[in-house]
UniProtKB/Swiss-Prot annotation:
Gene label: Phka2
Family named by the database record: Belongs to the phosphorylase b kinase regulatory chain family.
Keywords: Calmodulin-binding, Carbohydrate metabolism, Cell membrane, Glycogen metabolism, Lipoprotein, Membrane, Phosphoprotein, Prenylation
GO BP annotation list: glycogen metabolic process
Pathway: Glycan biosynthesis; glycogen metabolism
Bias type Low complexity, positions: 1039-1055
Calmodulin-binding: region residues: 807-837, 1059-1099
Modified residues (Phosphoserine): 695, 729, 735, 983, 1015, 1044
Species annotation: Mus musculus
Molecular function via GO: calmodulin binding
Name the UniProt record assigns to this protein: Phosphorylase b kinase regulatory subunit alpha, liver isoform
Known partners and oligomeric status: Hexadecamer of 4 heterotetramers, each composed of alpha, beta, gamma, and delta subunits. Alpha (PHKA1 or PHKA2) and beta (PHKB) are regulatory subunits, gamma (PHKG1 or PHKG2) is the catalytic subunit, and delta is calmodulin.
Activity regulation note: By phosphorylation of various serine residues and by calcium.
């Protein structure tokens, strides 16, 4: 008989260790592992980690087999692994209804359970009796299901199980916006059942999604039906959130040792090696002790000061756990494995020796890993005084199966029985490797031959959509409908993937569906849902952003292929040429670089061999799921609205279409636009039916009379609901109400019925002859208010032509005419919502940016601190906007732009925790008033008239603090809007905008506009306006340097006019902007935490920030920063808020002094007021009393607001003097005397 090799003997020793410490807890029926002999429940996460040693040992036996018995032993061990994984699968499949609900609700009550009965696979506690929602546990199951399947194990047996796993992918793909209870099952560290977004959960979910994508769950025995599909945009969302969170673990935990599992084995979720090292160093420096690592700071679990009779902690109680947190040896096993994967022999040796020193010797000398080490109750005070000096005692489970398993696995790796690639067959360990540069392939396609010809006139040879046949081209939303079919299973009542927006990563792949190649255009070119895609400049800007995004985030083999359609909406107003912005973009694409991204422009056929393909085999003819099986239910977006249809040239004759063609045609036709309204007439001799002689307010006045309402209407940008009563006009800038100009009474000949009320039937008859956009809008608005959106007009004798459908058609016409204020208002009437609104909001929240909507103060200003379903989010925005439709729509728009910037330029949001959308909109209007030198109402109207591109540009200038210029220009001759169009431009170092520097383009445009104006009838100008005045409005009105806070003749926040010079107002403007966007100095919150430790609290605008906050929260917690923000945000004036922040910064200097205490509550307001008085005294002594106007709301001098922080007469100088005076008796006597 062959002698046993040394390696075989060692493996037998590990086999005995595994049997005696792990497998002895495995249930023979279900395969689940109980937590201990006393605790019979099986935790999902613990079971997976506990079986890893068995999996690793099985592979070690298979590789080092000396005898047939070794191969048999390997098979037995592997089947123990399969049995456990299938046991967990059975537990989850019994809760299939929860998986289905959770996909749509993401509610903690609809989540899979975190633990099950070991013997029966049934649940053990109620839905609301445990912190069940633990995304990392479900994700860990999928991650190792993928890894084990790739290693050769067969865990999934049937297609029903495949469908369930596909739905588990949908369950975890929204992890980046799901607040859960985390790997410690506690959520917020107060243990009060408050879920929070956990970096560990996001990281493991990202790893699982990447690992299982395109994996055949049947392994070598599978086929196309057993492949799992993952959308890459969901993975990238997780990556982005991880990058923004780390090294923080969550809102309440500034660091967590559990992050070791995502920066190294098993998840390897972080791609930035520097971020990996920073996170690891933070864990070691803040959490490591002599016996392992603490889970997180102020962790009270099993400490002597924890009350074992209650689950939750009181907030101030957390301070008691500082420096006595229990230390867990399991984290050293992570660090050993991390060292092995990184090839760091010193780290491996150091932690192996340290771990050997704290292992418990059990029966027969086997090594056991205890759960944790705790401070003896009688040594607590000694540990408080001298941390890490007291000898600890082991507590908890012995062995701790999770730690025991990783200890054995690390030993097998360290001793060479396993290679790193064997426990990571999917090569996740290379996540930090340098990626090659990405070249984005761009195919420009003309919608039809006419557009193709127009492009050729400019020297651009492109294909039309018909030319690329047999490649099919479809809008991106069709891909969302198709993916809604993925994962459907009638046997288990699984509906598949919820209808969701698919990002540019998803649409930049080529798809093979039923042996046909499909390419999908990106959804930012789709006008289906919201008006952003109606602005060609916005489309170009989004193309630039998405190309840069593709270059940064593309991870797949092959190149991304972006199909950019040039449609009829990208033509000039008269349809004779391509829009200049689109032409310029195509020329830049031809150069090979666009917005910093490397691109290759070409035909689709040229890209077929270099593109990345996804085979959507779940749509194959022999699959059980029928395309038309549920077409009226979940395959449609819940907020579908009519649009301009799909790419008609790509469709085939009806008789030649197969089922797939018919299905796509049905999707397109079901959302195509039907025309009922009479066509618009652009000729000058066509008169305005109403708008040429009557303003909107006149129509509303007549409506009020018809309704018997006594209302006074101020000049407005758009109509508002008459039934809402005495509502003020849209005015975002506080200013004194000007005297109303008397408007002559016109004799309106409204059609009336026998009861002398407005006859809506006759009004519909007048609509038939109305060919002016604004007139059609006026009539439809009256019908909307008086009859409601669902009223059937029977226009032209056609049944089912509701007011809603006519408004939808009008929306499309307004889009073609670029009437942005009208577009925004109709969007509000139709309750259109941005398809990506919920995702945009979740992106901001996931980047630790809370949102408020509506104008301050509370309760009008609503805070959004957790992701909300789209319908609930939209309703909250309308409620916070006071049902002001225009503001509600603009709020959605701003949220989308903020999300774009937080993804592309996160540095813009440095030191910002709460984005107050209402204040941002108000400041945008204020900035326009300053630059245009106009009144508040005019600025508000101008803001609503901005194109989406200009709105986004203005927002960027607000966020960045850069100067900008505003240019006026007349509208096209057929425009129904009387207010001049304006555009936002960047101001260069010369003080001129880019268009002014170029000059020629603008001059040509003005000459063309003047010629068109000269040939027009006078009726197209506002009443009483002369031709010379109209032409004069073309002149640019801009501010090349910062001027007064709201312009040389506009108003300040207190309603007073400021007559300052062009160079004044810079610092007031800066403070107003920083206060509106809640920007604070670097390290502000940590400094506030320190000063709170030396006083009883800070009083800000009547609200106290108590010192007890530091008992609960640590200085670097996001939770603490949010708490400070909540107090500061009670101040409604942004410039005053910023002065308070400056005063607090001066106060924080005291935290560095040797004083233990500064006394009671410090009143920050009094310090600011005292500083203002000192400033006024100096100004009076200089004889400048004529410009010392005060803010009526706060009493602060405008000149003080506008003073620079530094300098002899800067705000910091006076604030320092005020602090010294306010706290004089408490300051050290040896301190420097204030001058």
């Amino acid at each position: 008989m062959r002698s046993r090799s040394n390696s075989g003997v060692r493996l037998d020793g590990y086999a005995r260790l595994v049997q005696q410490t792990i497998l002895c807890y495995q249930n023979p029926v279900t395969g689940l592992l109980s937590a201990s002999h006393d605790q019979k429940d099986a935790w999902v996460r613990d079971n997976i980690y506990s079986i890893l040693a068995v999996w690793g040992l099985g592979m070690a036996y298979r590789k080092n087999a000396d005898r047939d018995e070794d191969k048999a032993k390997a098979y037995e061990l592997e089947q123990n692994v399969v049995k456990l994984m299938r046991g967990l699968l059975q537990c989850m499949m019994r809760q299939v209804d929860k998986v289905e609900k959770f996909k749509h609700t993401q509610s903690t009550k609809d989540s899979l359970h975190a633990k099950y009965n070991t013997a029966t696979c049934s649940t053990v506690v109620g839905d609301d009796q445990w912190g069940h929602l633990q995304v990392d546990a479900t994700s860990l199951f999928l991650l190792f299901l993928a890894q084990m399947t790739a290693s050769g194990l067969r865990i999934i047996f049937t297609l029903d199980e495949v469908a369930f796993i596909q739905n588990l992918v949908f369950y975890i793909e929204a992890a980046y916006k799901v607040a859960d209870y985390g790997m410690w099952e506690r959520g917020d560290k107060t243990n009060q059942g408050i879920p929070e977004l956990n970096a560990s959960s996001v990281g493991v979910a990202k790893a699982a999604l990447e690992a299982i994508d395109e994996l055949d769950l049947f392994g070598a025995h599978g086929g196309r039906k057993s492949v799992i599909h993952v959308l890459p945009d969901e993975v990238e969302h997780c990556q982005s959130i991880l990058f923004s969170m780390l090294p923080r673990a969550s809102t309440s935990k500034e660091i967590d040792a559990g992050l070791l599992s995502i920066i190294s084995f098993p998840a390897f979720a972080v791609e930035d090696v520097n971020l990996v090292n920073v996170t690891k160093n933070e864990i070691i420096s803040k959490l490591q002790g002599r016996y392992g690592c603490c889970r997180f700071l102020r962790d009270g679990y099993k400490t002597p000061r924890e009350d074992p009779h209650r689950l939750h902690y009181d907030p101030a109680e957390l301070k008691l756990f500082e420096n006595i947190e229990c230390e867990w040896p399991v984290f050293w096993t992570y660090l050993i494995i991390d060292g092995i994967f990184n090839g760091d022999a010193v780290q491996v040796q150091e932690y192996r020796e340290a771990l050997e020193g704290i292992l418990i010797r059990g029966k027969d000398g086997i090594h056991l890993v205890p759960e944790l080490y705790a401070i003896p109750p009688d040594k607590v005070d000694e540990e408080y005084k001298n941390p890490h000096t007291v000898d600890r005692v082991p507590l908890g489970k012995l062995p701790h199966l999770w730690g025991q398993s990783l200890y054995i696995l690390s030993s097998l790796l360290a001793e060479g029985f396993l290679a790193t690639g064997e426990i990571d067959p999917l090569n996740r360990r290379f996540s930090t490797s340098v990626k090659p540069d990405v070249v984005v392939q761009v195919a420009v396609l003309a919608e039809n031959s006419h557009i193709k010809g127009l492009l050729k006139e400019h020297g651009m040879t492109v294909q039309s959509i018909a030319d690329v046949h047999p490649i099919r081209v479809q809008p991106g939303r069709i891909l969302s409908h198709i993916y809604a079919k993925l994962g459907r299973n009638k046997n288990m009542k699984l509906s598949g993937r919820p209808y969701r927006h698919i990002g540019v990563l998803g649409t930049s792949k080529l798809y093979v569906i039923r042996n046909h190649i499909f390419t999908f255009t990106p959804q930012f070119t789709d006008q289906h849902h919201f008006y952003l895609a109606l602005d060609n400049e916005m489309i170009v800007e989004m193309l630039r952003i998405e190309l840069a995004y593709l270059c940064t985030c593309w991870r797949m083999t092959g190149r991304p292929t972006l199909t950019f359609p040039v449609t009829h909406t990208m033509l000039t107003n008269d349809g004779s040429d391509i829009h200049p912005a689109v032409l310029s973009t195509i020329r830049k694409l031809e150069d090979g670089y666009f917005g910093g991204a490397r691109v290759k422009l070409g035909n689709l056929a040229e890209f077929l061999t270099t593109s990345f393909y996804t085979h959507l085999t779940f749509l194959d003819p022999d699959c059980d799921e029928k395309l038309f099986g549920d077409i009226t239910d979940r395959s449609f977006s819940p907020d579908s609205e009519p649009d301009l249809g799909g790419y008609l040239e790509d469709s085939s004759p009806q008789e030649s279409q197969d089922e797939l063609d018919q299905y796509i045609s049905h999707l397109l036709q079901s959302t195509s636009l039907k025309c009922y309204l009479p066509p618009l007439c652009k000729k000058s001799e066509d008169s305005h039916f109403f708008s040429a002689i009557h303003s909107t307010r006149d129509i509303l006045s007549v409506m009020a009379k018809a309704k018997g309402l006594e209302t006074t209407f101020f000049p407005m940008i758009l109509p508002t609901k008459v039934l809402s009563g005495h509502r003020k006009s849209l005015n975002l800038v506080d200013s004194p109400q000007p005297l109303l100009k008397t408007t002559p009474e016109y004799d309106y000949q409204w059609p009336r019925d026998d009861h002398d009320e407005v006859d809506c039937e006759k009004l519909v008859g007048q609509l038939k002859d109305c060919s002016n956009l604004q007139d059609q809008a006026d009539i439809l608005y009256i019908l909307y208010v008086m009859k409601g959106p669902r009223w059937d007009t029977n226009l032209f004798g056609q049944h089912g032509v509701t007011v809603h459908s006519l408004l939808s058609e009008l929306y499309g016409k307004a889009g073609l005419n670029q009437e942005w204020s009208l577009i925004r208002y109709i969007s509000g009437l139709l309750r259109k919502k941005v398809e990506v609104l919920a995702e945009a909001c979740a992106d901001l929240l996931s980047h630790q940016k809370q949102l408020t909507v509506g104008l301050p103060p509370e309760p009008r200003e609503k805070t959004i601190s957790t992701p909300l379903p789209p319908e609930e989010l939209t309703e909250l925005i309308y409620e916070a906007s006071g049902q002001d439709i225009s503001i509600a729509v603009l709020t959605q728009e701003i949220v989308v732009y903020l999300a774009m910037y937080v993804r592309a330029q996160p540095s813009l949001f440095a030191e910002m925790l709460r984005l107050r959308i209402g204040l941002i909109i108000q400041v945008m209007a204020t900035e326009l008033a300053r630059s245009l030198n106009c009144s508040g109402k005019e600025a508000s109207e101008s803001l609503m008239n901005l194109s989406p591109f200009d709105m986004k540009s203005l927002l960027h200038h607000i966020l960045s603090g850069k100067e900008f210029g505003v240019e006026r220009s007349v509208r096209p001759i057929h425009s129904s809007m009387s207010s001049p169009a304006i555009s936002i431009h960047e101001v260069g170092h010369t003080g001129a905008t880019k268009t002014e520097r170029s000059g020629i383009t603008r001059l040509r445009s003005e000459m063309k506009q003047m010629n068109r104006r000269a040939s027009a009838d006078e009726q197209f100008f506002p009443l009483g306006q002369t031709m010379s005045n109209s032409l004069h409005s073309i002149k640019s009105v801009r501010s090349s340097t910062p001027s007064s806070p709201t312009g040389t003749s506009s108003t300040d926040s207190g309603g007073q006019h400021l007559g300052w010079g062009e160079q004044q107002g810079q610092w007031l403007r800066r403070r107003r902007l920083d206060g509106a966007i809640n920007r604070v100095p670097v390290g502000f919150y940590q400094k506030v935490w320190k000063i709170l430790q030396k006083c009883h609290g800070l009083s800000i605008d009547g609200y106290v920030l108590p010192s007890s906050t530091t008992q609960e929260m640590t200085p670097c917690e996001i939770k603490f920063a949010v708490h400070v923000e909540s107090v500061l945000n009670r101040v409604s004036q942004p410039e005053y808020r910023q002065l308070l922040v400056e005063a607090i910064m001066v106060l924080t200097l005291l935290s560095d002094t040797e004083m233990d205490s500064i006394g009671g509550i410090i009143h920050v307001d009094q310090i600011v007021q005292l500083a203002n008085q000192l400033f006024l005294q100096d100004q009076v002594s200089f004889g400048t009393t004529d410009i010392l106007e005060k803010d009526q709301a706060t009493g602060i001098c405008h000149l003080f607001y506008d003073s620079a922080p530094s300098g002899a007469y800067g705000t910091m100088t006076y604030l320092t003097k005020a602090v010294a005076s306010h706290l004089q008796e408490l300051l050290p006597s040896s301190g420097c005397q204030m001058q």
